[in-house]
């Protein structure tokens, strides 16, 4: 090999150069060395590394089947007797069903159970038929396996009172909420893979990936923005569009056009019904409603003409605020838009700044940064990424020409320590790079009281007033905020940790729970639910009453129906571990080890150690890890060779692998269970040379099997007889710090429009607090298997004595001398985990290519044989005799634990362990149906839903308002309820031109019930306290017709619209948690006395008396508004 090989002696010498705790001055002895009848072996132990009580690691949201995990609950203490340390302590675990029935070779083996498994992160996770730690939910779309969603991931959602729409990578889909509790189509149904248990839905034709959605309920349209720069309109009522009986045909868009050169990041509809969209390069465009309306009236076969009509009407705001080449807004990407319907403004959100625009005049009002400071100039230089240090590029292995020649140890030490230092520097540099990222805005929402709330990557939530003044900061969770939504007087926050939090309007925390096992990327309210979408594509509906009495009723009722939706499946798992000593194996050796025992196996996990070693390789591996690269040609050779032995072309399918320096783990699943296996994630934790190099450490794979989570971890722990405490510390370090990579999920997050920096922000850049942050990924799994070269040796025994006992196959006494068993017995390592009875000879150390038990090391060192290569695991059993059910979903037993003594290619023997696992899981389609039956029939639940229909009694000061030019009238809304707040918002149900012949006018709504341009209403939404009132200004603003735009240029701006017009205002009233509303109708009429007035130039300031017009004398009201003395049609309401 080209790289330098580190032999065991050299490794020991190098270890003395590593900054680790010094050796003790006096010899110390572990409990395992007490009462030895043979020659005492001194244990030159390192100082015991203390285990920290807590660990600020990435928030754990991986919760098994994504709905049964809870971090709370009591677990039965470990069954192992810790007081009797000297006796054989093996426990026969209750065999799962269908095991050992008349077939002796499948009888479960006795197992030893380690102490200390009943507390902290080593506690068995709590499971239940219905999650005990969060509100029950409607599983509209259960978590699909990631592998089934390639090219089809859900990106975003939008909701109305009757439908939920979702944007996908390949189109649009929607659910009718009246069908939300219906059964899915099941496996083999006419639905794509991953949607077998999804409630009935409808899909569109294939489109470019969907970036954003907005619902226009006034015109029954759903608008979508796409990655190809197009905006599409979809009819909400697809039944009226379809002309055949086949409801499964994909539906088509009503109209579409090319809106941007880049992806359409966000769409909103302003208070005046115009559509605003944004994209890269700071581009914001407005699409006037009048043009959109005309395009929608064209026939489907005229869609090209409709697209051209809309495209030519665009108003580019960036060009309008650019003067002499200087733009008032930044050229960075506009990520979000927010329509402030209270004050008729639009907020445009860039990463570190906001711009606020007037929705009516389209003027730029203010530009401010995320700290609330007003910025006076745009086009700020983009933030430059930190450059990699030159030494990172050049100094992994190079030495100065002036240096004296160095020996092997010094050169190896320089290379490896240089790489370790590089890893630490990159980690520190990355933390600095994230310091700016943590301020970036990731979400924005308008609350019912008119305040604006924004969330950042750091978890900071900021409240703003409508003018961009920063009011308060709150921070209840130190993970990135990804989305908001509001319902009533509550604000819902979705985090990258999978948490949902509920806040009041003062920012105080009401409730919090883990909603998904992956980031919550979108929230939407409608139909009495708060719907959440996770990056994996799962959609859940949370009742708006949660947390509340409804939760306990549903949880109790649904738990009692467990037998109706509980299912069980069995799977056999083969685990193989081998320290290959930098060699390669023949096909016959691999067949002997693995291929010969896989006929009944569903999953195969293989771990190799010392695939490659040497200072050069370790340094290169560390360098590659810092830039996200892993693996090697030798590692790939091993994966291919093992795959060939498993017949992966016909029988097994390779799921994934992970390599860290010399450590390699890979996993295969049998093809006939492939539809139930997926969501593979990877992890690596280095433990060698300052916890930075992978010559020692662990690599892991996490996978979902029948909706349960299994973790497989391949380890290579510290070497040498005396390093027991270092081995214990290595295990503790791996168990606590193993965070499974979202490497495969990053593509999902990007597809979903989630900021990569938000998604990858880790605990080393953002502090973590609270018990919810302490759980590790491994602690949250249903089954965890550790295997590898653990390096625990036999103590208190000589080489010759060990050889004698081995030759006599007297393993009972040798097991008493096993360091690992002694450490597990006192709860120092592998706490609460189990190992089958060892009945094979020690697997280390052998002379290569020498068969039989005579092959043990006979060289000068004569290393004492030892069981270095082991397989240890835990499942969800809290006692040795648990049965598989939804409270204990994974029950496993070992039916084979062997070493392949005939394989001689390495100084270690390969070990294999076969498990039989019984897995209990939920049929989520059936459970959703049972939930629907409970919701429709339970009297207490129906009573709670009826209470949600309560709306406070309110009144308005008038139902008719008449305005003339520049008039302002006060509309008073009064809340007559003595106890309840009333939430109001004012929309325009339609506008019309008054006909001269007295016929009824045709009222047409603008986009999203927007106001006509001649009318201003302020405030258009808000909260009215009990027995209080609010004054709303209804103001007429002279409007010059600017409806027709060609390439953004007004074509007839010199004409004033002189026709009398009417608008119907809808004053909608809700309670603080109402699912229904009441509406007051107010007719507003504008009378124009002068019929025609042609002006040569558009006036900058409108005069009170236009030429030829007749004006009434006016009064100045206490609010500064004007009102004709002779007009009695409006009654001023009393202000309170």
From Swiss-Prot:
Concerning Pfam families, the annotation shows: Beta-prop_IP5PC_F, Exo_endo_phos2, Ig-like_IP5PC_F
What does the entry state regarding organ or tissue expression? Expressed in young seedlings and flowers. Highly expressed in anther and pollen grains, but not in pistils. Not detected in maturated roots, stems and rosette leaves.
- The ranges of region (Catalytic 1) come to 782-798
Here the cross-link named Glycyl lysine isopeptide (Lys-Gly) (interchain with G-Cter in ubiquitin) sits at 940
- Listed transmembrane segments: none
Which SMART domains does the UniProt entry name for this protein?
Answer: IPPc, WD40
For this UniProt record, the keywords arranged alphabetically read as follows: Hydrolase, Isopeptide bond, Magnesium, Metal-binding, Nucleus, Repeat, Ubl conjugation, WD repeat
This one is known as: Type I inositol polyphosphate 5-phosphatase 13
Give the record's family classification: Belongs to the inositol polyphosphate 5-phosphatase family.
Q: Using the UniProt annotation, give all residue ranges assigned to the region (Disordered).
A: 1104-1136
- Source organism of the structure: Arabidopsis thaliana (Mouse-ear cress)
Instruction: Name the major location.
Output: nucleus
**What GO biological process terms does the UniProt entry carry, in alphabetical order?**
gravitropism; phloem or xylem histogenesis; phosphatidylinositol dephosphorylation; pollen germination; response to abscisic acid; response to blue light; response to carbohydrate; response to nutrient
Record-listed E.C. numbers: 3.1.3.56
Assembly description: Interacts with KIN10, but not with PHOT1.
Q: Which GO terms describe its cellular component?
A: nucleus
Q: Which reaction does it catalyse?
A: 1D-myo-inositol 1,4,5-trisphosphate + H2O = 1D-myo-inositol 1,4-bisphosphate + phosphate
Question: What's said on domains?
Answer: The WD40 domain (1-533) is interacting with KIN10.
Question: What gene makes this protein?
Answer: IP5P13
Basic and acidic residues: which segments have biased composition? Answer: 1124-1136
What Gene Ontology terms describe what this protein does at the molecular function level? inositol-1,4,5-trisphosphate 5-phosphatase activity; metal ion binding
InterPro entries membership:
Beta-prop_IP5PC_F, Endo/exonu/phosph_ase_sf, Ig-like_IP5PC_F, IP5, IPPc, WD40/YVTN_repeat-like_dom_sf, WD40_rpt
């Amino acid at each position: 090999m080209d790289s330098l090989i580190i032999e065991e002696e050299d490794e020991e010498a190098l270890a003395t150069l590593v900054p680790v705790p010094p050796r003790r001055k006096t010899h110390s002895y572990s409990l395992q060395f007490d009462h030895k009848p043979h020659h005492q072996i001194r244990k030159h132990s390192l100082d015991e590394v203390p285990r920290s009580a807590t660990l600020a690691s990435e928030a754990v949201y991986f919760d098994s089947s994504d709905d049964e995990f809870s971090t709370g609950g009591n677990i039965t203490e470990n069954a192992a007797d810790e007081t009797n340390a000297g006796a054989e302590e093996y426990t026969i675990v209750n065999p799962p069903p269908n095991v050992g029935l008349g077939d002796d070779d499948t009888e479960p083996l006795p197992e030893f159970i380690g102490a200390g498994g009943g507390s902290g992160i080593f506690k068995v996770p709590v499971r239940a038929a219905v999650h005990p730690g969060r509100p029950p939910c409607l599983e509209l779309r259960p978590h699909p396996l990631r592998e089934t969603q390639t090219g089809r991931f859900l990106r975003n959602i939008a909701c109305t009172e009757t439908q939920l729409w979702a944007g996908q990578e390949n189109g649009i889909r929607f659910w009718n909420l009246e069908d939300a509790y219906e059964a899915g189509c099941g496996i083999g149904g006419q639905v794509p893979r991953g949607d077998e248990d999804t409630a009935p839905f409808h899909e569109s034709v294939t489109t470019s990936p969907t970036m954003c959605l907005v619902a226009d309920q006034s015109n029954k349209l759903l608008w979508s923005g796409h990655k190809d720069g197009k905006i599409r309109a979809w009819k909400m009522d697809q039944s009226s569009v379809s002309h055949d009986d086949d409801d499964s045909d994909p539906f088509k868009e009503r109209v579409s056009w090319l809106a941007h050169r880049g992806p359409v990041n966000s769409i909103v509809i302003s208070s005046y019904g115009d559509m605003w969209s944004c994209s890269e390069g700071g581009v914001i465009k407005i699409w006037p409603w009048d043009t959109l309306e005309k395009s929608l009236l064209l026939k489907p076969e005229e869609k090209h003409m409709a697209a051209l009509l809309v495209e030519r009407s665009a108003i580019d705001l960036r060009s309008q605020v650019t003067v002499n080449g200087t733009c008032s807004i930044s050229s960075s990407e506009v990520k979000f838009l927010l329509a402030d319907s209270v004050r008729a403004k639009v907020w445009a959100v860039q990463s570190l700044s906001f711009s606020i625009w007037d929705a009516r005049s389209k003027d730029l009002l203010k530009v401010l940064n995320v700290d609330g400071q007003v910025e006076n100039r745009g086009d700020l230089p983009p933030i430059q990424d930190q450059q990699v240090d030159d030494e990172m590029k050049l100094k992994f292995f190079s030495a100065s020409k002036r240096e004296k020649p160095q020996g092997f140890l010094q050169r190896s030490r320089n290379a490896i320590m240089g790489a370790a230092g590089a890893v630490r520097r990159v980690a520190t540099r990355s933390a600095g790079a994230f310091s700016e990222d943590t301020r970036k805005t990731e979400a924005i929402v308008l609350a019912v009281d008119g305040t604006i709330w924004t969330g950042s990557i750091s978890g900071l939530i900021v409240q703003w007033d409508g003018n961009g003044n920063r009011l308060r900061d709150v921070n209840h969770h130190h993970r990135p905020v990804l989305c908001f939504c509001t319902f009533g007087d509550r604000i819902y926050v979705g985090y990258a940790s999978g948490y949902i939090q509920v806040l009041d309007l003062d920012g105080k925390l009401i409730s919090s729970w883990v909603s998904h096992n992956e980031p919550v990327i979108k929230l939407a309210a409608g139909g009495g639910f708060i719907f959440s979408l996770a990056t994996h594509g799962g959609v859940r509906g949370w009742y708006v009453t949660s947390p509340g009495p409804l939760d306990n009723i549903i949880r109790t009722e649904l738990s009692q129906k467990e037998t109706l939706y509980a299912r069980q499946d069995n799977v056999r798992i083969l685990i193989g571990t081998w320290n290959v000593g930098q060699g390669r194996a023949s096909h016959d050796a691999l067949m002997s080890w693995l291929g010969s025992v896989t006929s009944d196996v569903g999953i195969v996990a293989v771990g190799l150690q010392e695939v490659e070693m040497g200072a050069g390789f370790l340094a290169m591996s560390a360098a590659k890890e810092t830039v996200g690269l892993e693996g090697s040609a030798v590692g790939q050779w091993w994966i291919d060779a093992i795959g060939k032995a498993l017949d992966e072309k016909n029988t097994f399918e390779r799921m994934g692998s992970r390599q860290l320096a010399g450590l390699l783990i890979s996993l295969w699943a049998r093809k006939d269970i492939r539809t139930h296996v997926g969501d593979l994630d990877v992890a690596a934790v280095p433990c060698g040379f300052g916890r930075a190099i992978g010559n020692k450490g662990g690599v892991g794979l996490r996978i979902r099997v029948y909706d349960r989570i299994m973790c497989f971890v391949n380890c290579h722990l510290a070497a040498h007889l005396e390093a027991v405490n270092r081995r214990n510390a290595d295990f503790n370090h791996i168990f606590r710090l193993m965070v499974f990579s979202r490497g495969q999920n990053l593509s999902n997050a990007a597809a979903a429009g989630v900021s990569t920096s938000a998604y990858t922000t880790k605990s080393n850049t953002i502090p973590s607090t609270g018990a919810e942050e302490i759980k590790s990924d491994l602690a949250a799994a249903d089954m965890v298997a550790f295997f590898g070269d653990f390096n625990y040796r036999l103590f208190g025994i000589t080489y010759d004595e060990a050889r004698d006992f081995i030759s006599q196959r007297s393993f009972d006494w040798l097991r008493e001398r096993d360091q690992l068993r002694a450490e597990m017995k006192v709860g120092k390592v592998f706490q609460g985990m189990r190992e089958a009875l060892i009945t094979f000879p020690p697997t280390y150390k052998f002379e290569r290519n020498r068969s039989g038990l005579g092959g043990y090391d006979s060289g000068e060192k004569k290393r004492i044989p030892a069981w270095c290569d082991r397989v240890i695991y835990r499942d969800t059993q809290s006692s040795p005799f648990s049965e598989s059910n939804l409270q204990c979903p994974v029950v496993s037993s070992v039916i084979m634990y062997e070493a392949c003594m005939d394989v001689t290619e390495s100084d270690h023997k390969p070990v294999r362990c076969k498990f039989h696992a019984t897995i209990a899981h939920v049929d989520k389609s059936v459970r959703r149906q049972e939930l629907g039956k409970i919701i429709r029939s339970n009297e207490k639940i129906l009573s709670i839903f009826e209470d949600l229909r309560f709306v406070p009694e309110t009144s308005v000061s008038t139902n008719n308002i008449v305005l003339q030019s520049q008039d302002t009238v006060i509309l008073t809304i009064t809340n007559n309820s003595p106890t309840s707040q009333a939430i109001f918002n004012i929309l325009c149900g339609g506008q019309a031109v008054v006909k001269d012949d007295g016929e009824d006018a045709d009222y047409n709504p603008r986009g999203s019930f927007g106001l006509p341009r001649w009318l201003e209403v302020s405030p258009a939404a808000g909260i009215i306290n009990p027995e209080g009132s609010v004054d709303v200004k209804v103001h007429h603003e002279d409007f010059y017709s600017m409806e027709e735009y060609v390439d953004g240029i007004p074509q007839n701006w010199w004409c004033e619209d002189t026709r009398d017009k009417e608008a119907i205002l809808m004053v909608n009233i809700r309670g603080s948690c109402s699912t229904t509303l009441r509406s007051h109708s107010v007719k507003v009429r504008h009378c124009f006395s002068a019929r025609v007035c042609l002006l040569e130039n558009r006036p900058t300031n409108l005069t009170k008396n236009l030429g030829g017009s007749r004006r009434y004398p006016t009064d100045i009201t206490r609010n500064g508004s004007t009102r004709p003395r002779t007009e009695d049609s409006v009654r001023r309401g009393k202000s309170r």
